[in-house]
Structures are given as C-alpha cells and as structure tokens.
Amino acid sequence: MKKYLVGGAVRDRLLQIPVKERDWVVIGTTLQDMLKAGYQQVGKDFPVFLHPKSHEEYALARIEKKSATGGYTGFTYKASSEITLEEDLKRRDLTINAIACDENGSLIDPYNGQRDLNQRWLRHVSEAFCEDPLRVLRVARFAAQLAYLNFRIVPETRLMMQHMISELPLLSPERIWKETEKALATRDPQIYFQVLRDCGALKTLFPEIDALFGVPAPAKWHPEIDTGIHTMMTVAMAARLSDSIAVRFASLCHDIGKGLTPRDHWPSHHGHGPAGIPLVQSLCQRLRVPNSIRNLAIIVTEYHDLLHYAVKLKPKTLIKLFYAIDVWRRPERLEQIIIISEADARGRAGYENHFYKPGQFIREAYRIASSIMPCQVISHNLTGNKIGEKLRQYRQQAIATWKQQNYESKQQ
C-alpha cells in the first residue's frame, strides 16, 4: 500500500497558502485491505475512507468514464489495486490539482502542474475535462480563489468551457449552489461570475444577472454606466467589507430588477427594487439557496436604495423601515443591509474610497429607537396590539427629537 497526498493540499503548500484539509489517494490495495486496516468507508459512489486516527480522507486510486450526460450520475468508476497514480491523477480537472506528494515529501507531477503554478495558469489535465460540466463552475471558482495571485485560464481551457455550456442545465441545483457558495467565500467572488459570463455560462445558470449587462444607469450616479459592471463592482466591494456569504449574495442580487426595465425608460429604473423581488425568489428557488440567504437578498433588493437617502427620510418612514426588516428580532440584519448599501454606493467608478455617511446615520437612528424599551409602554396599562402601537409611536418620537436636534437644526 502506497499513500500520496493529492489535490488542494499539495497545490496550496506549493503556493505557500495555509492548507485547510488534506486528501490522500492509496495505490496498490483493495477495499477489503482498507477495512482490515481499520479505515471507515464513507464513499457511496466510489471507495473513500476515513483514517482511524486523523479522520482524513483516503480514496482508492480510480479511473472514471462518462456513460451518460449529466453530473456524477453520468459516470462509471473503476477502483482497483492495479490502477496507477498517473491514471488517477489524469482524471482530475486542472494540472495544478493533479500533483501528488509521497510520504517522503517527493513530488509526482506527470502533467506539469508545477509549471502551471509557476506561470499562474489554470489548465485542464486532459480532454476528459469536458465530461463533467461542473468543471466549468470549478474553474471559475478557482479563478476567483486564486485571482489575487494573478492566475488566469489558458485559452484552450476557456474554449473547452464554452463547448460544455449545453450540458450545464443537467447539473443538479445542489451542485451549482455548492460551487457558487464556495466562490462567494473567495477574496474575489466577482471573478467567478465574470468567468461564467465570458464562457457563456452565466446566461444559462444566472440569466437574471446576465440580463444586467448592457443595461445603462444614469451617468450622474453611475459613472461606470453598465448595470452588470456595477453589480460586479458591488460584489467586489461587499467582499472587502464582509466575509458573510449572505451579504455577498445579496449584493449580487441588489439591482436585479433593473434587468426588467423597458428600454424606452432607460437609463431610469424607477421601482426596480420591488420589481426585482420575484426574480430573486425565482433564482433562489431554482438553485435551492438557503432560506436565510434568500430572505436577506429579498429585503436588500426591496430596500437598499432607501438607505442611501436615510438622512432625508421622515421618522415615520425610518421606523417603518426598521419594522419591515425586523431589526428588533434580528438586529444583525440591519448591519448586513448597511454593509450592502455601502458596497452599492462604493461599487461605482471613482467612489471606491468614499465614506458612506448614511450608514452612520442609520446605526445611530436604530440606537435611539432601541433605547425605548417595551417596559416603558407596559406601564400605561395597555394590552395586546396597543402595546406595540404605543411602542412604535414612542420610538418614532425619539427619532424625531434626535433628528431635529442633530440634523435639522444644523441645516437651518
């Protein structure tokens, strides 16, 4: 039995990136031998085992062959003690992921992965790359993950990705979302969507986002003009401001309604917030996006523009906004929405380093409103809904007083 460290652990070690998890491939052994050695089998589709002590994954070397269209269900696998390391590595997606390291630290690199690491290329290992359409998303995700190191996709791999678009609808929603979620967690999530657009996959997988490219916005507010470009800039800014997947996904969706604006109304997009809600719902339902992420995206789509004008809003409107986004039961949601609105404001050409004043105002308004406690209302011998109504009135009055003293009086 020979064991080799493979995949991302080897790649990241060579790039001097912290290794998060380690995967191993085992050569010259059988399923029965692994079980006798105390390994626990966990793979259903092919033999994957957990080490009895480290609990790291060990997989028998295998080869695979496409037997039908689609994702994993379209493959047949063969794992045996006779399969070589080179055969196992050949089935992998990119050369930089097809490097192995033996127990002595020696590298086995039959497909020139080290060369591509040094030259910062994302390159497919073999023609078998095109057999799994998920690899289009994986390459886009690696492009986002390694963009800060200046990795690029080689033209040959880009061309192959373009030829795989027709099979993307066969992917399960779970696989699409899993790759998208990983991409949203990278330093440069906007690169993922840009790569998908460049190869034609965005129109198939995210038509609501693809429709934003070429849609103009007023140059006065959006020097970058193109709504699709602005959306990518907003996602990039959101990634700078927050690690939250929910925040980053909501920033992707925030202007989705502008794709519905009739051409004769361009570049204005009145009512694009509420108009975008059904699109967000449809997108999230199609990809089976978790409810918590979906709910934030819907709220942001509807209300993000309102925050930009927060200082001009009447106290009644501010309170209505706070209740609409349920801030007293979900206080974390307000900060998420402020961050996304800031990303929206700074995700514009020339505004990247601007201070977002409405954020400070909204936080202070919420603090003032939250200083009014339910116990201050209950003492008025009110019952039922009247308690909530009175609490709302008190909070509105507190904001009105604070706003008049700190903002309106200074403007006079």
UniProtKB/Swiss-Prot annotation:
Q: Known Pfam families for this protein?
A: HD (PF01966), PolyA_pol (PF01743), PolyA_pol_RNAbd (PF12627)
- Annotated cofactor note: Magnesium is required for nucleotidyltransferase activity.
Q: Which UniProt keywords apply?
A: ATP-binding, Hydrolase, Magnesium, Metal-binding, Multifunctional enzyme, Nickel, Nucleotide-binding, Nucleotidyltransferase, RNA repair, RNA-binding, Transferase, tRNA processing
EC number of the protein: 2.7.7.72, 3.1.3.-, 3.1.4.-
Q: Is RNA-binding set as a keyword in this record?
A: yes
Q: Record's CDD domains? A: HDc
Q: Which GO terms describe its biological process?
A: RNA repair; tRNA 3'-terminal CCA addition
Q: What residues bind Mg(2+), as annotated?
A: E21, D23
Gene3D superfamilies from the UniProt entry: Beta Polymerase, domain 2 (3.30.460.10), cca-adding enzyme, domain 2 (1.10.3090.10)
Reported function: Catalyzes the addition and repair of the essential 3'-terminal CCA sequence in tRNAs without using a nucleic acid template. Adds these three nucleotides in the order of C, C, and A to the tRNA nucleotide-73, using CTP and ATP as substrates and producing inorganic pyrophosphate. tRNA 3'-terminal CCA addition is required both for tRNA processing and repair. Also involved in tRNA surveillance by mediating tandem CCA addition to generate a CCACCA at the 3' terminus of unstable tRNAs. While stable tRNAs receive only 3'-terminal CCA, unstable tRNAs are marked with CCACCA and rapidly degraded.
What family does this belong to? Belongs to the tRNA nucleotidyltransferase/poly(A) polymerase family. Bacterial CCA-adding enzyme type 1 subfamily.
Q: What else is known?
A: A single active site specifically recognizes both ATP and CTP and is responsible for their addition.
Q: What is this protein called?
A: Multifunctional CCA protein
Q: Which gene encodes it?
A: cca
